[in-house]
Amino acid sequence: MTALKNDRFLRALLKQPVDVTPVWMMRQAGRYLPEYRASRAKAGDFMSLCMNPQFACEVTLQPLDRYPLDAAILFSDILTIPDAMGQGLYFETGEGPRFKKVISTLADIEALPIPDPQKDLGYVMDAVSTIRRELNGRVPLIGFSGSPWTLATYMVEGGSSKDFRKTKAMAYDNPQALHLLLDKLAQSVTSYLNGQILAGAQAVQIFDTWGGNLSAAAYQEFSLAYMRKIVSGLIREHEGRKVPVILFTKNGGLWLESIAEAGADALGLDWTCEIGDARRRVGDKVALQGNMDPTVLYAKPEAIRKEVARILASYGKGSGHVFNLGHGITPEVDPEHAGVFINAVHELSAQYHQ
């Protein structure tokens, strides 16, 4: 494989020295970019973009052609695993993801297969290898998956939910059934991420989008325990380099200490945490990724730069910080403002790495 021309993202995740703080954005390949909207129109719909390796590669690279980002992230969806388990993923206009089959009984869960990454999710593996080849060493490629808890909520609710009442009711009424589902999902996520690593992903992130909606005790039992299981089963070295693992629980700021014990190299932070406090709490164990409020990108350029400067100062000197948003970039953001953000991180962070 081609040598990396820019490895500061991987170095920061491993707390090795860097020249400037690396930066990428969750959902950096997305609807805020006119070129993405053109590709999506050409593909026909969102799932056609995800399931065609050439289209997935095209949109993954678009933000890198526009901005000096330090990492690419595979263009895909967290719900590819439930779809490969036979749940029948589809998208309703204005409603988000839905499933034709909904999980409601132990029998439903027992019948679920564990997908084979090559056979059942081969289009994702093909996309990873295609993107890696096209990147040609420009920057590292991040693979990803949803967490078992987050995937389970979609499978039990049948789609998005505000209160996760069916999944939470299952947790309290029938924990045995939910644990079986989460265990199957943990096995599936482990093999899926390992498949991505073997196909060329140089770091992986687990998105625990809905873990922060659980009580502290339920988070430990139904979310963190399964992420810990996944982390322990991942390939951690490939092609002569460490493969860093990032865990991101949105609204998980109260539990950083226990997340830091899960075995990952880095924790993603949403914008409700103060990154300097997070560093004092867990910075000796893990790197940190984040954590600007994505809506700051609607503000004027000077305000964006000011907030970048504040977060950099809060983290302070030294490596171990990957700058990112606290969640995905939103569709109405002006692409010029995203550029201001990325350039500000590089320009204003150099002083912290001298």
Curated annotation (Swiss-Prot):
Pathway: Porphyrin-containing compound metabolism; protoporphyrin-IX biosynthesis; coproporphyrinogen-III from 5-aminolevulinate: step 4/4. The record marks 77 as: Transition state stabilizer. It catalyses: uroporphyrinogen III + 4 H(+) = coproporphyrinogen III + 4 CO2. PROSITE patterns: UROD_1, UROD_2. InterPro entries: UROD/MetE-like_sf, Uroporphyrinogen_deCO2ase_HemE, Uroporphyrinogen_deCOase. Signal peptide: none annotated. One of its GO terms (molecular function) is uroporphyrinogen decarboxylase activity. The keyword Lyase applies. The keyword Kinase does not apply. GO terms for biological process: protoporphyrinogen IX biosynthetic process from glutamate. It comes from the Bacteria. Pfam families: URO-D. Substrate binds at residues 27-31, 77, 154, 209, 327. Belongs to the uroporphyrinogen decarboxylase family. NCBIfam families: hemE. Homodimer. Catalyzes the decarboxylation of four acetate groups of uroporphyrinogen-III to yield coproporphyrinogen-III. This is Uroporphyrinogen decarboxylase.
